[in-house]
Design a protein with these regions (language model features):
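Structured, non-membrane catalytic/scaffold regions adjacent to prosthetic-group chemistry
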Residues: 42-264
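Intrinsically disordered, low-complexity regulatory segments
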Residues: 2, 19, 23, 42-47
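N-terminal secretory signal peptides
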Residues: 1-19, 30-34
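N-terminal export leaders
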Residues: 19-36, 159, 219
């Protein structure tokens, strides 16, 4: 995941101006018709719609992409011969967090992933617990917003399996919020949560996940840009709204002005 940002020119203390979904839909009749088909609005509209033309562009881009992906196709998968010999370690290579360093020295034996919020049975999973869940291995391209891409093999537990270990989500669940050791967070909607390639990866290219690539566990969201693929996962929370996280836009990158939906 790319973590060194050239920040957009924004007021860091300001919350993005909200535009009501009713106002937006009235200005985009085609999208309004699409939503009348019975699809969830969350599938087509970001958690917060920004003002002006950029907000309309956000929704049109996301809704068009999601309509094309309505059958939940897989992202392209590659052959082992296409794996990059060197996968960039971008941004934070080794968190300085004291607890993380202690867990690292212990081989992550005491590491735990709390799963809380709108689930039937909140729980805390060890790395071994996650490795015992059904797994998936995929060879995919990581497309970074910084302008580079690289192919790697990832093995991990589908996010849906992790939620099922907690008894599944309860009524009202709309987003899964993932927090990291180094202070990043992202919310992803249920459309991406249920996709089979959305995994929590603990292996890379056949070996344990390297520190620089997010050990012991990272998110792989194969149909979105690299900045959505969080490293160094610390916790998972299922929620009905992103309003109480950061500036309410749905993730730290969109708080900074990037698109919440980073489809590729």
């Amino acid at each position: 995941m790319s973590k060194t940002k050239t920040m957009p020119t924004v007021d860091p203390g300001a919350r993005p101006r909200r535009v009501s979904r009713r106002t937006l839909l009235s200005s985009v009749p085609a999208l309004g018709g699409l939503l009348l088909t019975g699809c969830s609005r969350d599938t087509f509209v970001p958690p917060m719609v920004r003002g002006g033309l950029i907000g309309i562009a956000d929704v049109l881009t996301m809704s068009t992409n999601r309509l094309l992906l309505s059958g939940q196709p897989l992202a392209r998968e590659y052959q082992p011969s296409e794996i990059a010999p060197d996968f960039p370690t971008w941004g934070q290579p080794n968190p300085r967090d004291e607890k993380y360093q202690r867990l690292l020295r212990g081989g992550f034996a005491d590491w735990r992933l709390p799963v809380s919020g709108l689930v039937e049975r909140p729980l805390s999973l060890s790395l071994d617990d996650i490795k015992r869940l059904p797994s998936r291995t995929q060879i995919t391209a990581h497309v970074c917003e910084q302008g580079w891409s690289a192919i790697a093999q990832w093995t991990g537990a589908p996010l849906l399996q992790v939620l099922n270990a907690a008894g599944g989500v309860t009524s009202g669940a709309r987003y899964v919020v993932l927090d990291t050791v180094d202070g990043w967070y992202e919310g992803i909607d249920m459309f991406e949560v249920v996709h089979p390639q959305t995994i929590l990866a603990y292996r890379m290219n056949g070996d344990d996940l390297p520190i620089g690539n997010g050990a012991p566990l990272r998110l792989r969201l194969e149909r979105q840009c690299g900045y959505k693929n969080l490293k160094f996962l610390k916790s998972i929370q299922v929620v009905d709204s992103m309003a109480d996280f950061g500036k309410g836009t749905g993730g730290i990158n969109s708080d900074w002005g990037f698109h919440w939906y980073g489809g590729v």
